[in-house]
Every structure is written in structure tokens, then in C-alpha cells.
Amino acid sequence: MAHTQEEIIAELGQIVEEVTGIEPSEVTVDKSFVDDLDIDSLSMVEIAVQTEDKYGVKVPDEDLAGLRTVGDIVAYIQKLEAEGAEAKNAE
């Protein structure tokens, strides 16, 4: 099942709070993890791992480096979910 942008942001907010203590309300689509939320690289890896577990996706390290904003991760998850649905439908 594909998730909406709002669902992903809400769930990502919970993950960010668990990892960093930042309030979920601070996690909005236009926020940069490093510049706006002041999240370090170690915390970003933990957020990525929990996001992978939550959505059943794999984010390669080279892709993770390009995911700088909350919106970037939302779009990436939606893309992976769409690709997964297409692959399932092709079977």
C-alpha cells in the first residue's frame, strides 16, 4: 500500500523524535535534516535504518547522501513504493 506524503511525514516525525528527541511537529516537508534540524550523520544513519524497517525498503548509501530534506525522503519512499507495486503487478 502506498503511503501519502502526510502519512510518511508523520511517521518520519516519530522516528526523528525517537532518534534525536526533536519534536515531530518540527519535521516538515521543507526542513533540511542537517541545516534546519541539526541532525548529525550518525543520527541520519539510524533514521535511515528505522525508515527502511518501517517501509520495508532499502536505501543504498549513495542514495542516502542525496536525501537532504524531509521532502527528499518522502519522495524517495513514494518512488520505491510505486516501483514495488509495479514489480508486483508485473508478476
Swiss-Prot record:
Record-level GO cellular component terms: cytosol; membrane
Principal cellular location given in the protein's record: cytoplasm
Pathway: Lipid metabolism; fatty acid biosynthesis
Pfam families noted in UniProt: PP-binding
Molecular functions per Gene Ontology: acyl binding; acyl carrier activity
Carrier domain: residues covered: 6-81
Matching SUPFAM superfamilies: ACP-like (SSF47336)
NCBIfam families: AcpM, PRK00982.1-1, PRK00982.1-2, PRK00982.1-4
Function, in words: Carrier of the growing fatty acid chain in fatty acid biosynthesis.
Protein name, UniProt field: Acyl carrier protein
Protein species of origin: Rhodococcus erythropolis (strain PR4 / NBRC 100887)
Gene behind this protein: acpP
